[in-house]
Swiss-Prot record:
Enzymatic reactions: K(+)(in) + H(+)(out) = K(+)(out) + H(+)(in)
Topology of this chain in the membrane: Multi-pass membrane protein
Family: Belongs to the CemA family.
UniProt protein name: Potassium/proton antiporter CemA
GO cellular component, one term: chloroplast inner membrane
One example GO MF annotation: proton transmembrane transporter activity
GO BP annotations, alphabetical order: potassium ion transport
Source organism, top-level taxon: Eukaryota
Lineage of the species this protein comes from: Eukaryota, Cryptophyceae, Pyrenomonadales, Pyrenomonadaceae, Rhodomonas
Protein's UniProt keywords contain Ion transport: yes
Gene: cemA
Function: Contributes to K(+)/H(+) antiport activity by supporting proton efflux to control proton extrusion and homeostasis in chloroplasts in a light-dependent manner to modulate photosynthesis. Prevents excessive induction of non-photochemical quenching (NPQ) under continuous-light conditions. Indirectly promotes efficient inorganic carbon uptake into chloroplasts.
Length: 278
């Protein structure tokens, strides 16, 4: 990993939240600097530090995103794919990994058979003998078997590749603690630089997306696709239990963060949020 130059970062980049709202302290510091005769050189130095902090944060953020993705795709295509295909084709006779796949396959085969009979009844297809119908159904069953074998092997590849990508991501986090501090400071400065209306808008947007009234449908889609991605059974009871509990916990965390943290660093943003949310 590249050796990041962090010597020029001032302690203000890592400042913690105090009992006095940050907006008030920053206003006082700004007024104090305007009266300082050496303020011009300090402004230039702060600009250089800010520019370095921005560049370092963007580089590290891109590193956190691209490296795990590259590891995921390369390991899946060139390492796990040949291994899983060989293991599944030689040692595995099952087509499905779970009952959810079976239900989807049987339902699709049943719809295909009903479609054939329906098209014959309304005259869209010529009359077929039972032997021809059975032949069409058998051909469809073979197609479905091939499709779900591929889905099963892809699920195993996804699981192995995602685990390796997650380990890579954790390694980058653990070995880049100083870069994480710079990135955290950069994000804080970016958020604090927004207007109170923009802060309140973003809070309302994220809370409505993740814990709003219509968020349950989104969580359901995400969970179903996530379980299917890893080849896990799509247990409806488990999905509904998660939807009934997790958004509530997340909403509590949001409210606690607003009360405990945001209320100290930006009271005006909290007031704007309450006015917009009413």
């Amino acid at each position: 990993m590249k050796n990041w130059r962090l010597n020029n970062v001032t302690p203000s980049a890592f400042e913690k939240t105090g009992p006095i709202p940050r907006s008030i302290t920053k206003t006082f510091e700004k007024f104090k600097k305007e009266l300082d005769p050496n303020s011009e050189s300090e402004v230039i130095e702060e600009f250089r530090v800010s520019r370095y902090q921005t560049a370092a944060s963007i580089k590290y953020l891109l590193l956190l995103i691209t490296v795990p993705l590259i590891v995921n795709q390369i390991s899946k295509s060139f390492v796990f794919s040949p291994f899983v295909d060989y293991f599944w084709n030689d040692n595995q006779n099952d087509i499905f990994l779970n009952e959810s796949q079976e239900e989807r396959a049987f339902s699709e085969l049943q719809r295909f058979e009903e479609k054939i009979h329906f098209e014959i009844l309304i005259g869209q297809s010529p009359p077929l003998s039972q032997e021809s119908i059975d032949k069409e159904i058998k051909h469809k069953a073979v197609e479905l078997a091939q499709y779900y074998v591929q889905e099963s092997t892809d699920a195993m590849k996804n699981l192995l590749a995602d685990v390796l990508a997650f380990v890579t991501f954790v390694y980058l986090i653990v070995t880049g603690r100083r870069q994480i501090s710079v990135l955290k400071s950069f994000v804080n400065e970016l958020i604090y630089g927004l207007s109170d209306t923009a802060k309140a808008f973003l809070i309302i947007l994220f809370t409505d997306i993740f814990v709003g009234f219509h968020s349950t449908h989104g969580w359901e889609v995400v969970l179903e696709n996530g379980l299917r991605h890893f080849g896990l059974p799509e247990n409806r009871d488990l999905i509904f239990l998660f939807i009934a509990t997790f958004p509530v916990v997340l909403d509590t965390v949001f409210k606690y963060w607003i009360f405990r943290y945001l209320n100290q660093v930006s009271p005006s943003a909290v007031a704007t949020y309450k006015d917009m949310n009413e």
